[in-house]
A protein has these predicted regions:
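C-terminal lid/capping helical subdomain adjacent to the catalytic/cofactor pocket in oxidative enzymes
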Residues: 122-180
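Short, solvent-exposed loop/turn segments at secondary-structure boundaries
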Residues: 79-83, 153-155
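Short, charged, low-complexity patches
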Residues: 84, 88, 157-160
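A short pocket-lining beta-strand/turn micro-motif at the edge of beta-sheets
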Residues: 65-67, 104-106, 137-141
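Mid-domain catalytic core of redox enzymes
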Residues: 1-67, 72-81, 98, 177-180
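FAD-binding beta-loop-beta segment adjacent to the flavin cofactor pocket
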Residues: 40, 51-62, 111-143, 147
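Flavin (FAD/FMN) cofactor-binding core of flavoprotein oxidoreductases
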Residues: 73-76, 88-136
Length: 180
C-alpha cells in the first residue's frame, strides 16, 4: 500500500471557511469501496483530526489542509509501481472528483508500505480463536497487533490494552515468569 499526503490551501476546498477549513464542513474523511474501481481506497482529512497541522504554512500565508490518501488493495501491486508523481496526480484527481477540491496540491509526499496490511483469508476468525485459546493456556502470555482483530490503529490499541491488562493481572497475582 502507499499513503499519498497532499497539502492544499484551505481555500481550495469549496465551502471551507477561512477560519474553520474542512473542520467547519464536518468532514473527517471517507472510505471507497472496491466496487467503485478507484485507486484511492480511503481518505483522511488530517487537519480535522490534528488541527495543528494547518499551522505548517509560511507565516502570513493561508493555512493548509493536509489530506492523506491510501492506495493499494490486494491484487493492485502494479499500481504501487508507478512513480511518486503519478501516484500523487492520481490521488489528487480522485480527491477532486470526490470533494470538488480545486487546483493542484501545493506539496505532496508518497510513503510506500509494501506488504503492510495483512490480508485476512477465509477461516481467519477461527484461527484467531485457536491462537487465543492456546495463549490462554500459557499464564502470563498475551498476543496483540494487526494480525488478530484488525489493522486499524484503534483495533491495534484495543488489542494492546487487552494484552497489557492480561499480563498486568497475572503479575499482580504474584506469579513469576517461567522460562523454559
Amino acid at each position: 500500500m502507499a499513503i499519498i499526503t497532499l497539502a492544499y490551501p484551505r481555500s481550495a476546498f469549496p465551502g471551507a471557511s477561512p477560519g474553520g477549513g474542512l473542520a467547519a464542513l464536518g468532514w473527517s474523511g471517507y472510505l471507497v469501496p472496491a466496487v467503485d474501481g478507484r485507486a484511492v481506497k480511503a481518505v483522511t482529512f488530517s487537519t480535522v483530526t490534528w488541527p495543528h497541522l494547518a499551522d505548517v504554512a509560511v507565516p502570513g500565508a493561508e493555512p493548509l489542509e493536509i489530506v492523506r490518501c491510501s492506495v493499494g488493495r490486494i491484487g493492485e501491486e502494479s499500481l504501487l509501481q508507478r512513480a511518486d508523481e503519478d501516484l500523487a496526480a492520481l490521488a489528487a484527481a480522485e480527491l477532486a472528483a470526490a470533494t470538488g477540491v480545486r487546483g493542484a496540491p501545493v506539496a505532496h509526499r508518497v510513503s510506500r508500505w509494501g506488504g503492510a496490511l495483512p490480508q485476512y483469508t477465509v477461516g481467519h476468525l477461527d484461527r484467531v480463536a485457536r491462537i487465543r485459546a492456546a495463549v490462554a493456556a500459557q499464564p502470563g502470555l498475551a498476543v496483540c497487533g494487526a494480525a488478530y482483530e484488525g489493522v486499524g490503529i484503534p483495533a491495534c490499541i484495543a488489542t494492546a490494552r487487552a494484552a497489557a491488562v492480561q499480563v498486568t493481572e497475572y503479575l499482580r497475582r504474584g506469579r513469576q515468569w517461567s522460562h523454559g
